[in-house]
Amino acid sequence: VNADVDASTEAEDTRYMRMALDEASTAASKNEVPVGAVLVHTTSGKILASHHNTVLAQDDPTAHAEMKCVRDGAAALGGWRHLRDTTLYVTLEPCPMCAGAVLN
């Protein structure tokens, strides 16, 4: 247990993860792969994007929750380089495509 993590940070993490889980539930209800993601600006706590997979609905193999959050977050912040001050909450380990986008 990290003693430096305060209760408010843990509560925020739990809140954002619950939002991601809600997105995953929405995906499941639409027969999509049940993955959800939420992108949060670390400094302000502002939610920049919240998505679920829509690969089937959009007939787009890149319409993963993580990719959609990265795209919307970059647009909201004025470019992908500004994503460094964000946290991405995802309901499972990202695939190689999404991991590459997140690490870039």
Segments (PLM) and residue ranges:
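Short beta-strand scaffold segments in enzyme catalytic cores
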Residues: 35-41, 45
